[in-house]
Amino acid sequence: MNHRIKSLLILLIVAASASIHASDIEPPFGIRHYDIGKAQNFSLLDIDGEPFQLDKTRGQWVFLHFWASWCGPCREEMPTLQLLADTFSDKQLKIVMINTAEDEDTIFTFLAAINVELNSLMDTDGLVTEVWRPRGLPTTFLINPKGEVKYQAIGGREWEKPLYINFIKQLVSNKN
């Protein structure tokens, strides 16, 4: 009898620990569950002319962020995105910034003026933005290591605040 109880307890513990997924982590205010399945792949050049493909980020959490230099909330939150990037290594959280439909000179001038070291992809024709359909700018999608979109944040955030940092720490420590 004692052996059966031990076996049952072990089975329950294993089942409970296996069932904890990123979707079970409750997001802070302003971030919503957005479980829409596999993230749509894309290829874009960054501001240095280097190619980027979303599918190559599999195996890590991705912070996919759509922005524009003319967007007031985008401008305000940019320094907090730099602090977020400084908090997490590229292996923990891949921050992917996509500028929507602006030219390279505009992007360079803007990023230099606000003194951040963030790289950005250039969606100069707006086609990737059309596919992803952010409901406003800025919009952030959080994509799990399996390549599935799990969360969305519309509008600017103070990403350096502990509630967002702690939420993202929970995500990156959970590989589901």
Residue ranges and their predicted role:
Residues 92-104, 116-125:
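Thiol-based oxidoreductase modules, predominantly thioredoxin-like and allied folds used
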Residues 109-117, 123-169:
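Thiol/disulfide oxidoreductase modules built on the thioredoxin-like
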Residues 8-17:
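Bacterial N-terminal signal peptides
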Residues 60-62, 66-70, 136:
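Short pre-active-site segment immediately N-terminal to redox-active cysteine/selenocysteine motifs
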Residues 1-8:
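Bacterial N-terminal signal peptides that target proteins for export
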Residues 19-41:
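N-proximal helix/coil linker or "cap" segments that precede and/or mark the start of modular domains
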Residues 34-36, 41-62:
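A short beta-strand-turn-helix
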Residues 66-83:
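Conserved redox-active cysteine motifs that mediate thiol-disulfide chemistry
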